[in-house]
Amino acid sequence: MTEVRMTSREARQECRVPFSGFVIHSSFSRRWRSGSALIAVFWMIAVLGMVMFTGAKALQADTDYTRTMRGRIFAKRYAEMGLELARHPAIQHDDPLLHFSSNDDGGYNVTLVSEEARLNINHLLQTGDKVLLRRLFTRWGFKPEFTAALYDALIDWVDADENVSLNGAEKREYEKAGLEGLPFNRPFKEVEEMLYVRGMDIVNTERPDWREWFTVFGSGMVDVNDASAELISLLGDVPMERVQPLLTFRAGRDGTLRTQDDQRLASVPQVAQMLGVFNRQTVEQLTQWIQFAGPIRRIESVGSLGPLQRKLILITQGGQAIWRGELPLHGKDS
């Protein structure tokens, strides 16, 4: 026999691998395994990239949350600073100390107004005054049926009995809605309680600033020297443009409210004349609804840090605090 010798290179070239009925050269098998490994590497890179991206986004979200919470805390601190400063009896509505800005883009702005420059919800309901509330809800765009039902539900909330008004809601109606222990059948102790009344959730959605219109303190007569233009328009039942002469008078010569030259309204005939109201019934209503120097003080302090703001309220009477809380700032980062 003739011995055949092959070099190692020739042997490798002649080595064959059976695969599915085909004979594959070893060089092709090696390239196939290398390609599979490369694909696996690409997959690992993609997975690691996704993990790193997710981690980075989570870290960014955590950082943003921490920054926001820090900003809210400092904004509230500034608001508290303004609130405590404004409590001093010597501070007047035009005092420059009511406004402060710091080097860290923070600060506070404080406003001193009469708490009675709002509608006293308890007084309106207990005296059976349907005119102002229905007029208000109608101006806010609510239909007459909803307005009537909401008014009756408010009446049922503050009266002492369990008799249901025509479109109102007492214990049974609230229980059907899954709400136990309602209504309280007593006057509102604070404005926020109004949110529990059936229908007020809709008002809260459509008019999130509704809290700014009401109070539970005072005699029930609105202080027109601090009342908003919208509220004065409501009281006089006149369009907004008719309120402008009154606003101009209050602002004084410099045209800026809450400065030293501000002027104060003093009588119902003066208010009626500026509003262009000469109807006897309307003048009589104004006599019942308005006053000119409410004794209850409302301190509104807005603290800020960058775009973040917090609004704190302190209500005082005779130098004593009777309510303190925080209200949302609508249309602002808070």
Name these PLM-found stretches.
Residues 1-34:
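N-terminal leader/signal peptides at the extreme start of proteins
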